Amino acid sequence: MASILDEYENSLSRSAVLQPGCPSVGIPHSGYVNAQLEKEVPIFTKQRIDFTPSERITSLVVSSNQLCMSLGKDTLLRIDLGKANEPNHVELGRKDDAKVHKMFLDHTGSHLLIALSSTEVLYVNRNGQKVRPLARWKGQLVESVGWNKALGTESSTGPILVGTAQGHIFEAELSASEGGLFGPAPDLYFRPLYVLNEEGGPAPVCSLEAERGPDGRSFVIATTRQRLFQFIGRAAEGAEAQGFSGLFAAYTDHPPPFREFPSNLGYSELAFYTPKLRSAPRAFAWMMGDGVLYGALDCGRPDSLLSEERVWEYPEGVGPGASPPLAIVLTQFHFLLLLADRVEAVCTLTGQVVLRDHFLEKFGPLKHMVKDSSTGQLWAYTERAVFRYHVQREARDVWRTYLDMNRFDLAKEYCRERPDCLDTVLAREADFCFRQRRYLESARCYALTQSYFEEIALKFLEARQEEALAEFLQRKLASLKPAERTQATLLTTWLTELYLSRLGALQGDPEALTLYRETKECFRTFLSSPRHKEWLFASRASIHELLASHGDTEHMVYFAVIMQDYERVVAYHCQHEAYEEALAVLARHRDPQLFYKFSPILIRHIPRQLVDAWIEMGSRLDARQLIPALVNYSQGGEVQQVSQAIRYMEFCVNVLGETEQAIHNYLLSLYARGRPDSLLAYLEQAGASPHRVHYDLKYALRLCAEHGHHRACVHVYKVLELYEEAVDLALQVDVDLAKQCADLPEEDEELRKKLWLKIARHVVQEEEDVQTAMACLASCPLLKIEDVLPFFPDFVTIDHFKEAICSSLKAYNHHIQELQREMEEATASAQRIRRDLQELRGRYGTVEPQDKCATCDFPLLNRPFYLFLCGHMFHADCLLQAVRPGLPAYKQARLEELQRKLGAAPPPAKGSARAKEAEGGAATAGPSREQLKADLDELVAAECVYCGELMIRSIDRPFIDPQRYEEEQLSWL
């Protein structure tokens, strides 16, 4: 058989697509140009399947991409549309004349029911090849099946509903399990539930649909030729109650609610629209004699599942007396009617025919039309051909329909991704609201459009709707981009003017107090809105001018605070002499620059509070920039003025640890003028090191001298290390102070002696106090009695110096005795050294014949060797080789030089006479051989190479010379 459903050909007949009449909108409000660059694809596109059946097609069903068609009376063709080139033929095995009446395929595409005209029903499962008759169903001509979408699976249908031509509704359940020869039958049970009646008695059950709502309620809609019945109820709990028995039992005593229409086609058909597989259906369409009953399905309603119902009459030429419709399918916004020679699509929103698709006569009359809910594709067939409809972008023009119906919310929903259409909808909605005098809503819509700003603003001005105009301006402002600064400035200024004008008009009216407060709150909300902050900040100058022109000082301050323009706020308070409020603003916002600017004003009026604020600011303030304000304030010299300045400067120095010289100098000047008792304490606390004090020493000296603070001057002299000046000035104040100064140059004994002589001269010549002069001798060991005697007058008797002279003589005698003792100790030490040298000359060591070199492990006596006191023995050449790497470069050079000279020196001559002659000749020529050997020994054998310092220094030396590391590494490869 040829490949099926994988190749398509273009439709042999052209579909007539009828565009619904739409009012011309002319030039759009926004200026958008809907430039359609590509040809619009039709919503419904028909394609003929490249398939020629071997026999007449009697029935066709599609679900979940599974297609089943009956050919002739005994063949079933099954096709998985995902594998269209692998069709499956199943023989029904019927030898009688029974024909296929209808076929039913569940939502999973797994369970197929074949109703025969002989009142028999066959069951075929997707995963099996066996056709199984349903014995319990025999005798019933099945017209409809209501599948159980909630409980149905590939292996079981769950409880389902079956409608017959006799008006009976049965409940059944099918299982795909074959179970062998003696296994259970596929029809687990088949029991009657209800009988549908019309006026003449039982009527065929044309359609059955069963659904379960989100709240657990069950809904069943059943149709006959003229009636549509609804069964609504909640299923009982338990496994047995999963079926529909309880639902239908509730209508035993009274009939269910139904809709009835008088005209009769002889049949009817019900179609549901379900957005997604296994989701709740959204809409229904019932094809009956009077037309198509269309509406929404609302599972939340207690008494009826149907809502928003309306009957669409059949298009012209369609109906019971003309060309009756054979089938109906429902999409999101259309229902399609199948006639014998054509398909007509009707918009469910307007009732207009949007498609009239005629079929060629060569294919024969159309039989039926079905929809695959899983893919949304529509299938129609004749006895000799199969056609498929693709539905593409069905909602593309729905927005225009809703727009014409003034259902703007739905119109916006369906054109949200099309800016040009959305702008048109918004403009129409804004115009509609404006005509309805809903000005605020109109302003909100206009703000979202691209309509001309000037026209809209003028429109509201002419209508004197300032509130709506403000709403429009605010929303336009919020939609501006950062680069649109000019527009933002215009809008913010205009809005401010509108608010101020409205506040001014309402302020004097006591009856409009509530409105005034509301407007005031709206204005403040506008000024403080984070969305507008950037634009308001850019326009703050013009807004301040507007506020000033209206005299609205309250909002001027409020706006300045919002814009963080605290300088303007503080200046306003200062101008109105509200200094404490100005300081409160400064303290709250902690801006150092504002403190620097306004401190000169505030310190004249609230000095204590301002200093408290400075202290609260701590290190955030630079005290140097506050000195000018303090200087101007403290020039009056009043105690309170100076004390506040001192309080802040002390805080800077003692708490903040300021080291800036200007601060310390100013504090010194304050102390010198207003608090001299703290001056000396400050100087002493600062220390006596000239490099560690933070004030200017020369300035401090001049300042203290000007104000006559001599003790402070003495301290500064000491810091400057001008000890003579310090002693001279201290002698004018206090001799004890001078003594303290004289002891300061500890390392310069000559200067100390000189200073003490100044003190002694002053005591002797100025105070004429001999006892105090003698006390000076005791205080300074550098002074002798002979140094002080010249200061005394001639008439002074020796009795005053007797003790001092005796003490001096005793000191000299003690010094002489110390010198003699040191000389004796030096002589004894020299004698001990001579004795040790004599003992060292006689020391020796014993070498045994079997002793070996500590380095090469060869017999020691074979070559010249060295013997160390530690016991280690080395050949001379081995020791030389071991010592050389550890010597510094200059010693290595010296070693090579000694070796070269020793090699060039003549060997020692035999005999004493010849030896003496050789020594004499060598002495004249250069160092002797013995001298060279001695130098070499001193260089090489000064200490044992294993026990000496050389071994200790070698502990961090690498085992392999870095210069030979690569060579050594390669040798191991």
Curated annotation (Swiss-Prot):
CHCR repeats lie at residues 618-772. InterPro entries: Clathrin_H-chain/VPS_repeat (IPR000547), Pep3_Vps18 (IPR007810). It is found in: Late endosome membrane; Lysosome membrane; Early endosome; Cytoplasmic vesicle, Autophagosome. Residues 454-481, 802-848 form a coiled coil. It holds the Pfam family Pep3_Vps18. GO terms for cellular component: actin filament; AP-3 adaptor complex; autophagosome; clathrin-coated vesicle; CORVET complex; early endosome; endosome; endosome membrane. The modification N6-acetyllysine is found at residue 362. Residues 903-929 are annotated as: Disordered. GO terms for molecular function: actin binding; protein-macromolecule adaptor activity; syntaxin binding; ubiquitin protein ligase activity; zinc ion binding. A zinc finger (RING-type) spans 853-947. It is a peripheral membrane protein. The modification Phosphoserine is found at residues 3, 11, 13, 689, 912. Its main location: membrane. The modification N-acetylalanine is found at residue 2. Keywords: Acetylation, Autophagy, Coiled coil, Cytoplasmic vesicle, Endosome, Lysosome, Membrane, Metal-binding, Phosphoprotein, Protein transport, Transport, Zinc, Zinc-finger. GO terms for biological process: autophagy; endosomal vesicle fusion; endosome organization; endosome to lysosome transport; intracellular protein transport; lysosome organization; negative regulation of intracellular estrogen receptor signaling pathway; organelle fusion. Ubiquitous. Expression was highest in heart and low in lung. PROSITE patterns: CHCR. Core component of at least two putative endosomal tethering complexes, the homotypic fusion and vacuole protein sorting (HOPS) complex and the class C core vacuole/endosome tethering (CORVET) complex. Their common core is composed of the class C Vps proteins VPS11, VPS16, VPS18 and VPS33A, which in HOPS further associates with VPS39 and VPS41 and in CORVET with VPS8 and TGFBRAP1. Interacts with RAB5C. Interacts with HOOK1. Interacts with STX7, MON1B. Associates with adaptor protein complex 3 (AP-3) and clathrin:AP-3 complexes. Interacts with SYNPO2. Interacts with PLEKHM1. PANTHER family: VACUOLAR PROTEIN SORTING-ASSOCIATED PROTEIN, VACUOLAR PROTEIN SORTING-ASSOCIATED PROTEIN 18 HOMOLOG. Belongs to the VPS18 family. This is Vacuolar protein sorting-associated protein 18 homolog. It comes from Homo sapiens.
